[in-house]
């Protein structure tokens, strides 16, 4: 069995139109599908991704009734990143952010790759990460209708950063249950401890989950990151269900999320993971 890199990230927002305006008009992401929230059909669920709606490029946003004012804390998905083709693409987006008064910080490195931290419409810290020196899982397909030039478009998910109160517990889930490999570590200024890098599938930025054991922050934000999805084949999805049962990890049943099948579970620290199959947004 093996996982095949990142599949999607799910976030929540209380202002779905503002979210759409930011991610489509500012970042240039393609809206793949607008549908209803399965848990609350009065609320919307939007899917963004590359031109083909490929796994590894998907951002799912769920509308909620009220804004969530919570602190950055441990046992959460701290941030996610979005892949752009080159280092110069980061500069292009920096100019774009200046024009649109979008807050951003100085360029840093995530596992050796240049990344530009910025703050989205809900106050989340998101990283644009350069694919210039990346190897492994390839970028997705550009969208001809995007308002960002094809050579600079966001074409995939990059590393997802998890802040865990017990790094060993979350790490063991990644390696022993989901078959990721520990490949490296690096320093990130926001944390005292090293960030540990775990890799899925063919690796590279599109297959990385980064785990750090850090302290809670007093900084508040307006919405959170719900879960991270990892890609699997449909056959392997059933095998992972059996594995979760064998190690007594509570999990959902395999469910049909309209565009792909999925099973989700929480690790001992409360981080929500999904195992998801190849998407089809032509339904």
Segments the model singles out, each with a brief description of its role:
Residues 33-36, 48-82:
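Conserved donor-binding loop and adjoining core beta-sheet/short helix segment
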Residues 35, 45, 91-156, 184-210, ...:
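Vicinal oxygen chelate
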Residues 1-18, 77-82, 133-171, 225-228, ...:
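N-terminal beta-strand motif that seeds the catalytic metal site of vicinal oxygen chelate
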């Amino acid at each position: 069995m093996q996982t095949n890199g990142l599949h999607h990230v799910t976030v929540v927002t209380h202002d779905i139109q503002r979210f759409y305006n930011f991610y489509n008009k500012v970042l240039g992401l393609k809206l793949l599908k607008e549908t209803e929230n399965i848990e609350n059909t009065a609320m919307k669920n939007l899917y963004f991704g590359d031109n083909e709606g490929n796994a590894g490029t998907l951002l799912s946003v769920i509308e909620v009734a009220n804004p969530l004012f919570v602190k950055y804390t441990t046992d959460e998905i701290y941030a996610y990143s979005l892949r752009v083709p080159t280092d110069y693409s980061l500069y292009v987006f920096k100019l774009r952010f200046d024009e649109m008064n979008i807050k951003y910080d100085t360029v840093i490195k995530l596992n050796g790759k240049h990344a530009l931290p910025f703050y989205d419409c809900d106050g989340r810290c998101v990283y644009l990460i350069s694919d210039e020196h990346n190897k492994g899982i390839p970028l997705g397909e550009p969208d001809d209708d995007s308002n960002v030039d094809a050579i600079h478009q966001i074409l995939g998910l990059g590393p997802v950063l998890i802040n865990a109160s017990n790094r060993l517990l979350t790490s063991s889930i990644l390696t022993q249950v989901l078959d990721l490999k520990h490949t490296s570590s690096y320093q990130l200024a926001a944390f005292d401890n090293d960030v540990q890098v775990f890799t899925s599938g063919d690796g590279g930025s599109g297959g990385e989950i980064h785990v750090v054991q850090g302290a809670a922050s007093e900084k508040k934000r307006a919405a959170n990151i719900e879960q991270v999805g990892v890609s699997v084949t449909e056959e392997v999805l059933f095998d992972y269900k059996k594995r979760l049962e064998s190690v007594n990890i509570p999990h959902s049943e395999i469910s049909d999320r309209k565009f792909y099948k999925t099973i989700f579970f929480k690790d001992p620290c409360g981080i929500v993971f999904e195992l998801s199959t190849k998407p089809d947004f032509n339904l």
